[in-house]
Amino acid sequence: MFCVIYRSAKRDQTYLYVEKKDDFSRVPEELMKSFGTPQLAMVLPLDERKKLANADIEKVKLALQEQGFYLQVPPPVENLLNTPV
């Protein structure tokens, strides 16, 4: 299984994973509007990998099979002023 990863033109650290290059047919239209023009980041063979840098590989595979896409959003920003020392 391969996946194609696109970077969002509108949202920092937001990535869209799809099964085929330039095939966004299963991605909801509203998501595509808020995502902006997809910028190709990379193509990955998922069968040969055990983990991904910032996403659970099993969740990615399942989402690709069931929904046809996986959306990776950045983690929430931590306010260091509120962190106890």
Curated annotation (Swiss-Prot):
Residues covered by the YcgL domain: 1-85
Domain of life of the organism encoding this protein: Bacteria
InterPro entries in UniProt: YcgL-like_sf, YcgL_dom
Xref: Gene3D superfamilies: YcgL domain
Pfam families: YcgL
HAMAP family: UPF0745 (MF_01866)
Name this protein carries in UniProt: YcgL domain-containing protein PC1_1941
Source organism (scientific name): Pectobacterium carotovorum subsp. carotovorum (strain PC1)
Classification of source organism: Bacteria, Pseudomonadati, Pseudomonadota, Gammaproteobacteria, Enterobacterales
